């Protein structure tokens, strides 16, 4: 089957020892109904679909060019399912918004500014290698799709990311390679008529490991000369990609369509306004203060409107008012630019290199962890720092690159900062971009996680705006971070540079401005923001209204910015020269480490142990996979307490006899209470010891004296071979616990009711032969029943009892007069009369109740109500004392009875088992 005709071109990027990268543009297969559609591939591994579409008709009442750039991150591109509730993509991420800005800024100046048809560029990320960033690929794809769309576009423009790695500028570096980057720079530009590359956009910053690489490994410092060299290094790569786009245009571009352009004003209207208002505007544009200047300009505009009310009657009122506003604004622009180019005179009277009045102050907001106010002229920034546990660092659901960050910089500019009203709430693209730039400027000087184990949120509130609030945010953030006690490696300052270009006496000249005002930003050709320490640059951003700026002009602007940066750093150092003491309201975080195999013990089943530690101490605990533990609390005392508990779990101390503890009751039973001595270590305080807390009086239940959660002072009475700990009340440690001794290998009864492992019968009554409170000496003359120790004395004198495999079960030939013991084989359990015959006993002893007529046994799950907590009250076992009224008689009778031999019972038979 015949398919669509696919056309493709390639651009090969040679990085020398770092290998080659191939950027391929393909069109004809996808999105065939868009005006322009290009699929861009990087090494056939990452794929971006770019489409450019224009509206069929111009937008009415628009006085600007309506260009929209959108980036659609598809999670399937990285083999992921979206983490949202509905499991589908939603609002764009911050990374997508920053990519939109990188694309929009170099594209917008290349369209006619009088075009009013809406143009939309959509970048869809279809596939991405986790080791590659997609933003620069999308920038090149956007230019390519616009080039073939038939729109009036003065392209191509192309972009490249360079990273300074081991002294070499590497194009399209991978994320793994960027770990060793001292500096990264994204440069976009276009080839001009003389074959040179004019730079249209810059976004740059030092690497997050730059400080270590520079000062510990001796790598190249990204100062002004090095960064200028990076701009030059980008030109060959930009030229190669632009040539590929030109080739694609030749083979696949549509014919350029005719679009209606809307001039902002007529030449006649501009000349008339210049005649009326030039002198007044010239004076008004010399007023230094922003608001008085704006008020005076508004008065002049109203005067012009009144004068022209009866003129230009061929235009309707709305059209006339719009053109009047555009022409009036253009007149202001020309006055400001002319004075700068010819007189080196600026609006507020400063020279080209002068900085406005500076002021800095810290600790102006109570209770917050750190705060500062930085003011430059009428630009005023409030910086606020918040510290917290590392578990509060931001998790990023990105297609590639870092998945978390511990330093988060949020920039906010409310409408009142310019004396206006407007929407407040969620951040706009501009606010996200400014916050990212300020964040980029400060990341290289932050302490490492090991040096300062905190998540840091920095908020910059632009509460007054008249030029370069983003660079003011960098200065305010430095002050605020130091005030919060963050040990920055060096203070950082930022400055915004401007540019005005034009022809003077037949020569095209450029004038660079330091610390631009808002009006100079609006009327100038460039907004060039530079941030850094006293020794190197940490962040750069360039936006321009020109088609491009020569690299040598930018290099000179970098040197001019360095002078201004040094002046601002002096003011910062005078205000605060180092990290202050941390606020009393800031959490104190201490660290410890546990062996990886002990992490489970610290956390406990379902987090029980770690939650208990946090509840008991009030500290917050976070454990990393390598066993590093971060503990946080206000004031630090709770954190120290939690650390000691965690250390005791990781390196447990086994309690020894004689040691005293203030333990917490964690469980009560019928035979005693379990007391927690150290995390994960409990001991048993027997009920006989608990009586000592009640002045030795008898207690019916442990809960009458101790309850779960109570604290009790105990002493370790002993530790058996299996690590079971017996506790006592101090002063009574020599008192023996009245616990039932071992009956074979019976282990701990606290679990199931198994009968094979019963060494520890805590809380039971012991075996019959060992019940100390029975006195059998005063009984009648009946021969005592032999106990187990009697059998040892005459064992050798008795005939060996035949085992089941060699004895004759017919015992009719026995040599004694005892009736033979009936075997289960010949018992007729249906004959109830034979059983009743046994009730006619020849003594006065009450017959032993059989299981058939023991009505009171019932459900024995709760055995705490019985006498001595194990087998029911004696009155329940002897019908003679069946009522509670006779209980005292029962006790007295027991004291008078003589010892009788223990009745032999098979070892595996317990008549009181359920």
UniProtKB/Swiss-Prot annotation:
SUPFAM superfamilies xref list: Eukaryotic type KH-domain (KH-domain type I), Nucleic acid-binding proteins, Polynucleotide phosphorylase/guanosine pentaphosphate synthase (PNPase/GPSI), domain 3, Ribonuclease PH domain 2-like, Ribosomal protein S5 domain 2-like
Keywords: Cytoplasm, Magnesium, Metal-binding, Nucleotidyltransferase, RNA-binding, Transferase
InterPro entries recorded: ExoRNase_PH_dom1 (IPR001247), ExoRNase_PH_dom2_sf (IPR036345), GPSI/PNP (IPR014069), KH_dom (IPR004087), KH_dom_type_1 (IPR004088), KH_dom_type_1_sf (IPR036612), NA-bd_OB-fold (IPR012340), PNPase (IPR012162)
Ranges of residues in domain S1 motif: 658-730
Catalytic activity: RNA(n+1) + phosphate = RNA(n) + a ribonucleoside 5'-diphosphate
Keyword Magnesium assigned: yes
Positions of region (Disordered): 407-427, 727-914
GO CC terms of this entry: cytosol
Keyword GTP-binding part of the UniProt annotation: no
A molecular-function term among this protein's GO annotations: RNA binding
Biased composition range(s): Basic and acidic residues: 742-789, 797-865, 873-899
Domain of life from the UniProt record: Bacteria
EC number: 2.7.7.8
Segments forming domain KH: 587-646
PANTHER family: POLYRIBONUCLEOTIDE NUCLEOTIDYLTRANSFERASE, POLYRIBONUCLEOTIDE NUCLEOTIDYLTRANSFERASE 1, MITOCHONDRIAL
Protein name, as recorded: Polyribonucleotide nucleotidyltransferase
């Amino acid at each position: 089957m015949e398919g669509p005709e696919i056309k493709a071109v390639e651009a090969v990027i040679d990085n020398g020892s770092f290998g080659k990268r191939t950027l391929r543009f393909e069109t004809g297969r996808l999105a065939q109904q868009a005006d322009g559609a290009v699929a861009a591939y990087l090494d056939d591994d990452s794929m971006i679909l770019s489409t450019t579409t224009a509206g069929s008709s111009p937008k009415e009442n628009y006085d600007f060019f309506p260009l929209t750039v959108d980036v659609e991150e598809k999670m399937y591109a990285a083999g992921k399912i979206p983490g949202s509730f509905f499991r589908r993509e939603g609002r764009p991420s911050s990374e997508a918004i920053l990519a939109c800005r990188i694309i929009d800024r170099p594209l917008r100046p290349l369209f006619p500014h009088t075009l009013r048809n809406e143009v939309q560029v959509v970048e869809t990320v279809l596939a991405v290698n986790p080791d590659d960033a997609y933003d620069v690929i999308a920038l090149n794809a956007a230019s390519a799709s616009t080039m073939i769309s038939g729109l009036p576009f003065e392209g191509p423009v192309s972009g490249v990311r360079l990273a300074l790695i081991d002294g070499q500028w590497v194009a399209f570096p991978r994320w793994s390679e960027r770990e060793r980057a001292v500096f990264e720079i994204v440069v976009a530009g276009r080839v001009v008529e003389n074959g040179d590359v004019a730079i249209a956009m810059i976004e740059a910053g030092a690497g997050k490991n730059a400080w270590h690489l520079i000062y510990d490994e001796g790598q190249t410092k990204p100062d002004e000369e090095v960064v200028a060299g990076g701009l030059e290094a980008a030109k060959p790569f930009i030229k190669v990609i632009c040539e590929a786009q030109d080739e694609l245009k030749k083979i696949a571009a549509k014919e350029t369509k005719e679009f209606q352009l809307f001039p902002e004003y007529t030449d006649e209207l501009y000349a008339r306004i210049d005649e009326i208002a030039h002198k007044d505007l010239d004076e008004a544009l010399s007023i230094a203060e922003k608001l008085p200047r704006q008020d005076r300009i508004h008065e002049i505009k109203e005067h012009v409107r009144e004068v022209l009310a009866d003129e230009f009657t061929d235009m309707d009122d709305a059209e006339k008012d719009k053109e009047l506003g555009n022409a009036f604004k253009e007149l202001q622009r020309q006055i400001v630019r002319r004075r700068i180019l010819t007189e080196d005179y600026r609006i507020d009277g400063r020279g080209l290199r002068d900085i406005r009045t500076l002021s800095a102050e810290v600790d102006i907001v109570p209770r917050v962890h750190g705060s500062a106010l930085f003011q430059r002229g009428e630009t005023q920034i409030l910086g606020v720092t918040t510290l917290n546990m590392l578990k509060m660092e931001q998790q990023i659901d990105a297609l590639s690159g870092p998945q978390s960050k511990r330093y988060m910089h949020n920039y906010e500019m409310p409408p009142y900062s310019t004396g206006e009203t407007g929407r407040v709430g969620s951040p706009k693209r501009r606010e996200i971009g400014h916050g990212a730039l300020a964040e980029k400027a400060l990341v290289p000087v932050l302490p490492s996680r090991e040096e300062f184990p905190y998540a840091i949120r920095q908020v910059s509130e632009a509460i007054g705006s008249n030029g370069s609030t983003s660079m003011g945010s960098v200065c305010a953030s430095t002050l605020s971070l130091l005030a919060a006690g963050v040990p920055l490696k060096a203070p950082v300052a930022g400055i915004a540079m401007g540019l005005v270009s034009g022809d003077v006496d037949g020569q095209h000249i450029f004038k660079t401005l330091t610390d631009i005002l808002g009006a100079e930003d609006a009327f100038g050709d460039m907004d060039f923001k530079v941030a850094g320490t006293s020794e190197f640059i940490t962040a750069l951003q360039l936006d321009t209204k020109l088609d491009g700026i020569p690299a040598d002009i930018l290099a000179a602007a970098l040197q001019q910015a360095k002078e201004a940066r040094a002046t601002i750093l002096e003011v910062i150092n005078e205000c605060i020269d180092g990290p202050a003491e941390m606020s009393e309201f800031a959490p104190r975080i201490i660290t410890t480490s546990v062996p990886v195999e002990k992490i489970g013990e610290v956390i406990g089943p379902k987090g029980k142990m770690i939650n208990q530690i946090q509840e008991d101490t009030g500290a917050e605990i976070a454990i990393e996979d390598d066993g590093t533990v971060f503990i946080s609390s206000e004031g630090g005392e709770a954190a120290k307490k939690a650390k000691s508990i965690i250390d005791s779990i990781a390196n447990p101390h086994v309690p020894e006899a004689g040691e005293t503890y203030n333990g917490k009751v964690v469980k009560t039973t019928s035979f005693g209470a379990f007391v927690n001595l150290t995390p994960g270590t409990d001991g048993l305080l027997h009920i006989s010891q608990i009586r000592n807390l009640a002045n030795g009086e008898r207690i019916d239940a442990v809960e009458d004296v101790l309850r779960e959660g109570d604290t009790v002072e105990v002493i370790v009475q002993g530790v058996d071979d299996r690590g079971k700990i017996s506790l006592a009340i101090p002063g009574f440690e020599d008192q023996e616990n009245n616990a039932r001794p071992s009956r074979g290998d019976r282990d701990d009864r606290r679990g199931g009711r198994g009968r094979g492992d019963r060494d520890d019968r805590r809380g039971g009554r012991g075996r019959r032969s060992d019940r100390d409170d029975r006195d059998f000496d005063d009984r009648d003359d009946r021969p005592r029943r032999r106990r187990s120790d009697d059998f040892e004395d005459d064992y050798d004198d008795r005939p060996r009892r035949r085992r089941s495999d060699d004895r004759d079960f017919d015992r009719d030939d026995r040599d004694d007069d005892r009736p033979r013991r009936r075997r289960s084989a010949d018992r007729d359990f249906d004959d109830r009369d034979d059983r009743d015959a046994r009730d006619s006993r020849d003594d006065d002893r009450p017959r032993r109740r059989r299981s058939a007529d023991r009505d009171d046994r019932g459900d024995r799950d709760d055995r705490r109500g019985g006498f001595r907590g194990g087998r029911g009250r004696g009155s329940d076992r002897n019908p003679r004392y069946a009522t509670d009224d006779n209980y005292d008689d029962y006790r007295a009778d027991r004291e008078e009875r003589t010892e009788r031999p223990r009745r032999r019972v098979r070892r595996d038979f317990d008549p009181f088992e359920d």
